[in-house]
Structure formats: C-alpha cells, structure tokens
UniProtKB/Swiss-Prot annotation:
InterPro entries: FAM78 (IPR029638). It comes from Homo sapiens. This is Protein FAM78A. PANTHER family: PROTEIN FAM78A. Belongs to the FAM78 family.
Amino acid sequence: MPGFFCDCWPSLEIRALLYAMGCIQSIGGKARVFREGITVIDVKASIDPVPTSIDESSSVVLRYRTPHFRASAQVVMPPIPKKETWVVGWIQACSHMEFYNQYGEQGMSSWELPDLQEGKIQAISDSDGVNYPWYGNTTETCTIVGPTKRDSKFIISMNDNFYPSVTWAVPVSESNVAKLTNIYRDQSFTTWLVATNTSTNDMIILQTLHWRMQLSIEVNPNRPLGQRARLREPIAQDQPKILSKNEPIPPSALVKPNANDAQVLMWRPKYGQPLVVIPPKHR
C-alpha cells in the first residue's frame, strides 16, 4: 500500500534534560526548503552532558561507556505524484580515529583504519553494516512510498556512543597480569541528513553535522581491581556543530566496508616489529 513507514519519535525525557542544561544545538525557527519541495523544519544535535563511565567489574577487561551523541530532525515530504520511493535518513562517516591502549614500557595496542590513516580515503562509512549507506533502519530512516496525496511529516533520530572492552593484560601475552596504564581515544565524525529517491538514485543533502568524542583514562595496574582507573580531561565533550553550509558526502562513506569491518587491532611494542592481533573482517 502507498504511504510512509517510520518509527521515529526520540525520547522526550532525554530531550527535556538536554534542553534544561542548554546542551542541544538546534536550527529551529525558519524552515528550510530543498529540491523536490522537501522541508526541514528543525534539526537538533547534542552529546549527553555526563562523563564517561568506567567499569572494573571484570578481572579480564576494563570497560567504559561514553556519553551518547544524539541527532533528530523534523522533515516534511510533499505529496509524491508518481509511483516512486523516497528514503530520508542519517548517514554517518568517521573522518579521524586515534585509539591507543598503553601497557607501560612494553608497548601499546592500537585500533586502526589503514586506508583512512594513510590518506587513501577522506572518511569511512559508519553504517550498521547491513543497511548501506544508512546508519540504521529503525528510527534512523523513514521510507515514503508514492503515490501520496498529502504531506508526510515525520521525525528521524539516531544516537551513537562507544562501549568497548580493553584487556588489563598485554593482548599478545599469555600472562594475565594487569599491565594497562592508559587509554586514549579521539574520533571525529560527519553526519548527514539525506533524502534519496530509490528509483532514480537522486540524493539530496539536507543537513550536515560535525561531532567529536575524546577520551583519556589513566590506569594504575598495581592497585586493587575497582580502584585502578581514573578519567582524565576532557570530562565533558564538545557539543556537535550544525553546519550552515552542507558538505558533500565522500564516495567511501556510502559503500562497504564500514569502520567496524575495516578496523584492525595492532600490537606496537616499544622494541621490535608491530604485530596484527585482530585482522580486519573486510579484506
């Protein structure tokens, strides 16, 4: 049946908290009209105003959970006279990644994106790995199937955060003795609000966002479990930027592989040759 399908309403409680703390960036006010009569009424973006939490409950790994990046947009699609399908949603790509886990004087493990690091691509897709090029296919997209006789008004939203595990012991060692001394992470992302005609592959960029997540955790492996790790600056993250001028989407952000499938875990000892610990899933 012609119509539109989306499950798109963000958490009102979270949005109310962020508004109260002055953390939501918004372009609310005058609606913006794009090609094909697509109207963006409002775009909001924020990073939750809470510090990264650290979990030392495991004797094998340290876990941490960063605050969430959140974005939402209210969009109006005009009537679609033809038998065609439009998808409106979020596309995200990683443009910079540094992710090091230091093990004292022995060396460090490092999650790396080789093509990005070597400058072969501008950015790498951060799709869920199934619904390329979209970040996801639940609240992150809305599909409108024509013909339709009236406006379709909807909200699409997305969120992202990091929740990894880092081994206390050197990852290439048979020893289980804790040696982890520091975790450092710095990643930058570009997030686009996009409308695509699936019949013609016409793509319209409606909004561009920039955001960054930075993390530094100091670890004393000689202390008892539960007392080893301490979050260092920055405690609070910089809020996302909603750009006044849209940026084009690099071709590499629209296709396989995504960042999760392309990343490789390296062991880089202080002395000796680097070693691949976990190869990329996509070759």
